[in-house]
Amino acid sequence: MSKKPVRVAVTGAAGQIGYALLFRIASGEMLGKDQPVILQLLEIPDEKAQKALKGVMMELEDCAFPLLAGMEAHGDPMTAFKDADYALLVGSRPRGPGMERAELLSINGAIFTAQGKALNAVASRNVKVLVVGNPANTNAYIAMKAAPDLPRKNFTAMLRLDHNRAASQIAAKTGKPVSSIKQLAVWGNHSPTMYADYRFATIDGASVKDMINDQVWNKDVFLPTVGKRGAAIIEARGLSSAASAANAAIDHMRDWALGTNGAWVTMGVPSNGEYGIPKDVMFGFPVTCANGEYKIVDGLAIDAFSQECINKTLAELQGEQDGVKHLI
């Protein structure tokens, strides 16, 4: 019995991340090789962007993906999000030269307020929303607040890129395959303040912390390398990380939809007070996923250094949220 197609809305669909993402969704990498999809693609309603989107859709057609059951181009979130089962909010305004962070927050605040309202009005009541566009945590917070009729838990922010970056650095340090690393956590904001935490991580049952046994490397090499990786890629490539961001979005949605079999992954989710994080703060936590739901890993001990790192990233997030309070 073949499955009924699900509707996947993607914003910023003709952008760099969108281009790296759509073909993988259409091939079944995100929701499974037996799940047909209808892509509902949103771009800004400007002639150049809509024309570029048409070109991407022509390429998608030319792949003849068996699972691609339909495609639509949109310039308005009210039509793009209609009955959406999944929404990947990729499009956001990047920070331009000389632009203050407050200005960036304000511009994106308006975008994500409108998108949250549209999701609230027309999306499936079970829609799973992933915000990729930066500042991802705060944009997800804004969208969630603009959608009071949808469950808070349906809104998430992407911390998976930080998680994957941390895993690859640990693999390089230990000489072990990245697939062998279990129970890694990333806490907080998708920004250089995020706290990648391998205190509970294992490789083949052995403690990664004991294996590395180097707090100076952790503090002075590992955390800054993971935190500033995005900037290092811009410096090297002249463009921001698009393919790795798209890959992380696929990982995040696949695990949320299909489950992690007990494995820990990192998602930015609205807090309910876990680990002392105030309610509603969109915060990176270690989670497990099953039956289409995520659950924060509880009962983890937080030592003094970890608490200091968590407090720092929380303070940054609360500062961002205070900066958009007037939009909500």
Swiss-Prot record:
Give the reaction(s) catalysed: (S)-malate + NAD(+) = oxaloacetate + NADH + H(+)
This protein is called Malate dehydrogenase
Q: Which residues bind NAD(+)?
A: G12, A13, A14, G15, Q16, I17, G18, N108, Q115, V132, G133, N134
Write out the entry's keywords from A to Z.
NAD, Oxidoreductase, Tricarboxylic acid cycle
The cross-references to HAMAP family, in alphabetical order and at most eight, read: Malate_dehydrog_2 (MF_01517)
Keyword Transcription regulation applies: no
Q: Which Gene3D superfamilies match?
A: Lactate dehydrogenase/glycoside hydrolase, family 4, C-terminal (3.90.110.10), NAD(P)-binding Rossmann-like Domain (3.40.50.720)
Q: SUPFAM superfamilies recorded for this chain?
A: LDH C-terminal domain-like (SSF56327), NAD(P)-binding Rossmann-fold domains (SSF51735)
Give the top-level enzyme category: oxidoreductase
Q: Name one GO biological process term.
A: tricarboxylic acid cycle
Q: Which domain of life is it from?
A: Bacteria
**Biological function:** Catalyzes the reversible oxidation of malate to oxaloacetate.
Q: What Pfam families does its record include? A: Ldh_1_C (PF02866), Ldh_1_N (PF00056)
Where is substrate annotated to bind?
R95, R101, N134, R165
Catalytic residue positions: H190
A GO molecular function annotation here is:
L-malate dehydrogenase (NAD+) activity
Q: Which family does it belong to?
A: Belongs to the LDH/MDH superfamily. MDH type 2 family.
Q: Which EC number applies?
A: 1.1.1.37
Species name for this entry?
Methylibium petroleiphilum (strain ATCC BAA-1232 / LMG 22953 / PM1)
Which gene specifies this protein's sequence?
Answer: mdh
